[in-house]
From Swiss-Prot:
SUPFAM superfamilies linked: Aspartate/glutamate racemase (SSF53681)
Pfam entry (one): Asp_Glu_race
Organism of derivation: Agrobacterium fabrum (strain C58 / ATCC 33970)
Binding, substrate: D19, S20, Y51, G52, N84, T85, T199, H200
EC number from the UniProt entry: 5.1.1.3
GO process annotations (BP): cell wall organization; peptidoglycan biosynthetic process; regulation of cell shape
Family label: Belongs to the aspartate/glutamate racemases family.
Primary role: Provides the (R)-glutamate required for cell wall biosynthesis.
Name under which the protein is recorded: Glutamate racemase
Catalytic activity: L-glutamate = D-glutamate
Pathway, per record: Cell wall biogenesis; peptidoglycan biosynthesis
Listed GO MF terms: glutamate racemase activity
Amino acid sequence: MLKTSEAAADVLKPVLVFDSGIGGLTVLREARVLMPERGFIYVADDAGFPYGGWEEEALKTRILSLFETLLQDYSPEVCIIACNTAFTLAGADLRARFPDMTFVGTVPAIKPAAERTRSGLVSVLATPGTVKRAYTRDLIQSFATQCHVRLVGSENLARMAESWIRGEPVSDEAVLAEIEPCFIDSDGKRTDIVVLACTHYPFMANVFRRLAPWPVDWLDPAEAIARRARHLVPLPQDAEHPDGFDFAVFTSGKPDFATRRLMQGFGLSVSSN
């Protein structure tokens, strides 16, 4: 595993994918399909997980400090912030602090939801931090004023998703309690789209579908985020996938066995850094 400063000068710079935990793997999976020539570094701030309960200024300071180190160590081509909470809070500050770096953000997919809905009833399933952020409400004001948008902030679902991804049991009753507020049945109309505004949630989409009181479109933004990154990352002629990258970094420095095994399933070794 290489830091960019240790790599040969002609090696393609890696793509850095950042999340509070392991939910950003949904974005990594799509990005790899579109950028096979690039190495990937997945950074999980598991020492700070979950982000939903943090005070805003403290979390913003933490994220900016982490990126001071990450950009110095790995000099990526682009950084994908695969976390709605992190980007809606600190995205503008990251771009201002590091103007030479390209950041691709993750925001609630409210615009495509508003374009697709037939009933006009859309729900946004997110963390409490994303729900209360002015950024989210600005998206609604800009793109969805013709819809009724319900914001559902789940305190527990990101943790449940982390457990579920690792193969640990999560009860149907507990999951249903988190997603049930998304479903509105009013005046002969029903919610027909639920925006998954946390990158952890798509891992549980099949569980959501099974438990939902009626079928809806569960909108996963991962592919759109990956397409945006592909658009911004140059594709050199005769590019070959570099050796030494494709690893995960955990800010705790101590991912458990189940997490290491999960990373291997995504083709990532775990950095000892």
